């Protein structure tokens, strides 16, 4: 009885799944080094954004996100700022986990990019169901789209298996 040989697409799909969900999480990273730099940049930006919200939540909500806090009663405006702060704490925790992965558990870098992508996608879904009233064209929209692009690029590059120089040079 002959067994069917898996085709190339099945092998690469299995390889991608193994890189996304590794059996062992250690520091043996196989993806592009550029993805590591992208993750580091994203950690820095997300951490800066989160700290800014925690320190000056009202100002950030109005200027960066275009939320007209002055048009709401004081209690409602305070609740909006508190929800922003809670979101910032969650982002800081994810950023801390990203730092741990970047330093000690690099095999999980693709999984972290996937987590960041899922976080963004679910945030967009929630934003469609419960839209936030904004004034003008807030810069946070452009920044978030930039971070989305970097997340997708980082995910692709982290899954892209790095070849050794000898493999590139030899025919």
Residue ranges: model-predicted function:
Residues 1-28:
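Short, Lys/Arg-rich, polar N-terminal cytosolic tail immediately upstream
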Residues 20-34, 75-85, 103-107, 134-138:
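Juxtamembrane loop-transmembrane helix junctions in multi-pass integral membrane proteins
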Residues 66-67, 133-146:
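Non-cytosolic membrane-interface motifs at loop->transmembrane helix junctions
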Residues 149-169:
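Membrane-water interface at the C-terminal end of transmembrane alpha helices
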């Amino acid at each position: 009885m002959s067994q069917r040989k898996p085709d190339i697409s099945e092998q690469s799909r299995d390889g991608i799944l193994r890189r996304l969900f590794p059996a062992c999480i250690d520091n043996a990273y196989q993806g592009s080094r550029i993805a590591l730099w992208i993750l580091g940049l994203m950690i820095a930006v997300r951490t800066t954004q989160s700290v800014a919200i925690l320190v000056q939540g009202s100002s950030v909500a109005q200027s960066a996100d275009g939320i007209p806090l002055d048009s709401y009663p004081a209690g409602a405006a305070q609740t909006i700022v508190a929800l922003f702060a809670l979101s910032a704490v969650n982002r800081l925790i994810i950023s801390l986990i990203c730092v741990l992965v970047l330093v000690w558990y690099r095999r999980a870098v693709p999984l972290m990019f996937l987590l960041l992508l899922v976080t963004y996608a679910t945030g967009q879904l929630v934003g469609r169901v419960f839209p936030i009233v904004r004034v003008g064209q807030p810069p946070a929209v452009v920044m978030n789209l930039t971070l989305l692009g970097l997340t997708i690029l980082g995910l692709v590059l982290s899954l892209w298996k790095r070849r050794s120089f000898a493999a590139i040079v030899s025919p």
